């Protein structure tokens, strides 16, 4: 038997037992002729003691260095009271070693366990980075989460059904990863951005409760919470309304948080998209942050300051304020930095009012715009925003989109910078009633979610006549400012589906080429169906307390979609390209021998 126990699971109940352990040397210490090591495996650490009287084991122990892979046999014994280490789970015991085997020696590690390593180094030597207890713990938590999800879904009558990885390219919002076909030369498969259409087809097939923990692929610009390949908890149901789907999925998440964190999230509030954007400047509001956007355009329509009155009198404009409690202490330099920050979102400046003594009216405030305000207007602003002495008001005045985006981002930054966000709390909610379409910047419309989302309470003819007013029967689950899941009621009418395609500018010919199989399936008694997909990686990220999705994926990609460890992507073998009838072109020239002209 290679091992009888895991290092990190030993405790006082094992005292007197002989155990065999396998793992790595985490640290070695020579203390006055005695040798101690901390031995590590996936479950944690335990202290091992080598006595000179056990000559063979002691001699071999003198050769040990960090990260040697070893096996040892010894007796568990209680530590003296004075030597108990309360910072270790195994701190009440130690192993008195009788026998030691060095399974494999280790060279000096390229990662330093005593300092912070660069992310580049951690990704290049990921197999070593994963030995760190905090990384191992995150992957253990991930495994615990997926096991919990499977049990929950099985208990609620959902069937785990796999869908294809090699499929057809369909427009779902991001670029596809393409896979060339050797058999069908000149043709390509696409790796799925989601199992969306296949799970809808499963509903049409009669499998009324489906789930799958599945890899998805999107060739898009990356950031801290995105990866080119990611994992979804994918769910679809038939004969369930949107509130019923939300109820089951909310139960899943509430029970998951209780299991992993011991936290009862309580009932999730439901907020419309319009309210979220109006109050928080985001469709995924972080409710731990108490700051809100307050509309004040009606109070500023008639003032002589055109920066305010212009947008206030424009149907497409917005003037809003954020009250920051205690913010009057901010320096001019800090305020200027916030002004530069919102320029990222198209804002042209950041007006402010410092409220020093509210009772004194205009004499009690400090502001470059105060000279444009009457006592009545100032009083109305302070009442509307509930401003108190010591507060500061920040204003945004521009198009509705610029103001909403800029103040929404400023709200989050202020919450972080001024420690207003309650970092140790959980604030989940549902966001519903999204617009079905949004302008695409080229005079057309694009689907805000995806083109298979059903509208709320509209006939195809009504949708075609006024698509801009359509509200999607969609819902997102948001926790602490992260969208952890999103779903919708799906279109189950061929007429409605084709109406949506036409609104999106997809011609009849394109509809047949790209979605003919779906349109055909919709002819044969399609049930009403709805679903949702959770981002597993984001859930694990939240539950393990990290803000980087790469910390919860065993072998992630960089923000440039590269694997530093395997050096993927790589150039293809020329023989393979020839077999696939593919010529690689770089800067307009065919690459020779699978290499670019710049190599």
From Swiss-Prot:
Name assigned to this protein: Aspartate--tRNA ligase
Record-listed E.C. numbers: 6.1.1.12
Reaction it catalyzes: tRNA(Asp) + L-aspartate + ATP = L-aspartyl-tRNA(Asp) + AMP + diphosphate
PANTHER family on file: ASPARTATE--TRNA LIGASE, MITOCHONDRIAL, ASPARTYL/LYSYL-TRNA SYNTHETASE
Keywords: Aminoacyl-tRNA synthetase, ATP-binding, Cytoplasm, Ligase, Nucleotide-binding, Protein biosynthesis
GO terms for MF: aspartate-tRNA ligase activity; ATP binding; nucleic acid binding
Binding site for L-aspartate: 172, 218, 449, 490
Record note on quaternary structure: Homodimer.
Gene Ontology biological process terms in this record: aspartyl-tRNA aminoacylation
Gene name of the encoded protein: aspS
GO CC, alphabetical: cytoplasm
Primary location: cytoplasm
Function: Catalyzes the attachment of L-aspartate to tRNA(Asp) in a two-step reaction: L-aspartate is first activated by ATP to form Asp-AMP and then transferred to the acceptor end of tRNA(Asp).
Location of the protein in the cell: Cytoplasm
């Amino acid at each position: 038997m290679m091992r009888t126990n895991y290092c990190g699971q030993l405790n006082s109940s094992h005292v007197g037992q002989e155990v065999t352990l396998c793992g790595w040397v985490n640290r070695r210490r020579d203390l006055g002729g005695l040798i101690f090591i901390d031995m590590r495996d996936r479950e944690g650490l335990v202290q091992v003691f080598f006595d000179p009287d056990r000559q063979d084991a002691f001699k071999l122990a003198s050769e040990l260095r960090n990260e040697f892979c070893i096996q040892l046999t010894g007796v568990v014994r209680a530590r003296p009271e004075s030597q108990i280490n309360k910072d270790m789970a195994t701190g009440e015991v130690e192993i008195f070693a009788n026998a030691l085997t060095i399974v494999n020696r280790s060279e000096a590690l390229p990662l330093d366990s005593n300092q912070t390593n660069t992310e580049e180094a951690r990704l290049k030597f990921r197999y070593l980075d994963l030995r760190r207890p905090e990384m191992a713990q995150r992957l253990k938590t991930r495994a615990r989460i997926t096991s919990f999800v499977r049990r929950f879904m099985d208990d609620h009558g959902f069937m785990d059904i796999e869908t294809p990885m090699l499929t057809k390219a369909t427009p779902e919002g991001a670029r596809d990863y393409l896979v060339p076909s050797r058999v069908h030369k000149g043709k390509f498969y696409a790796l799925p951005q989601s199992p969306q259409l296949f799970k809808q087809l499963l509903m049409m097939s009669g499998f009324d409760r489906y789930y799958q923990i599945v890899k998805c692929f999107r060739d898009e610009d990356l950031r801290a919470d995105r990866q080119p390949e990611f994992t979804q908890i994918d769910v679809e149901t038939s004969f369930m309304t949107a509130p019923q789907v939300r109820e089951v999925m909310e139960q899943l998440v509430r029970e998951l948080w209780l299991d992993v964190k011991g936290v009862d999230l309580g009932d999730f509030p439901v907020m419309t998209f319009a309210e979220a954007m109006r109050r928080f400047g985001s469709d995924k509001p972080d409710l731990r942050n108490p700051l809100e956007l307050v509309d004040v355009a009606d109070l500023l329509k008639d003032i002589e300051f055109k920066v305010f009155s212009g947008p206030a009198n424009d149907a497409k404009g917005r003037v809003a304020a954020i009250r920051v409690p205690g913010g009057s202490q901010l320096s001019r330099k800090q305020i200027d930095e916030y002004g530069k920050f919102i320029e990222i979102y198209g804002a042209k400046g950041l007006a402010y009012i410092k409220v020093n003594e509210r009772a004194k009216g205009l004499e009690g405030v400090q502001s470059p715009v105060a000279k444009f305000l009457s006592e009545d207007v100032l009083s109305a602003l302070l009442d509307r925003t509930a401003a108190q002495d010591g507060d500061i008001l920040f204003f945004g005045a521009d198009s509705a989109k610029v103001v909403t985006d800029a103040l929404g981002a400023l709200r989050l930054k202020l919450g972080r910078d001024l420690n207003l966000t309650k970092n140790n709390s959980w604030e989940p909610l549902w966001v519903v009633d999204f617009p079905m379409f949004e302008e695409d910047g080229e005079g057309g419309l694009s689907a805000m979610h995806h083109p298979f989302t059903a509208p709320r309470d509209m006939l195809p003819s009504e949708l075609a006549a006024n698509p801009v007013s359509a509200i999607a029967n969609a819902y997102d689950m948001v926790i602490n400012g992260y969208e952890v899941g999103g779903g919708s009621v799906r279109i189950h009418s061929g007429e409605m589906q084709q109406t949506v395609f036409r609104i999106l500018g997809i011609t009849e010919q394109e509809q047949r080429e790209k979605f003919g199989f779906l349109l055909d399936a919709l002819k044969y008694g399609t049930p009403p169906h709805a679903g949702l997909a959770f981002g597993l990686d984001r859930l694990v990220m939240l539950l393990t307390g990290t803000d980087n999705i790469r910390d919860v994926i065993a072998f992630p990609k960089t923000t440039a979609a590269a694997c530093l460890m395997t050096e993927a992507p790589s150039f293809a073998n020329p023989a393979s390209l020839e077999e696939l009838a593919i010529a690689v072109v770089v800067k307009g020239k065919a690459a020779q021998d699978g290499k670019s002209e710049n190599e």
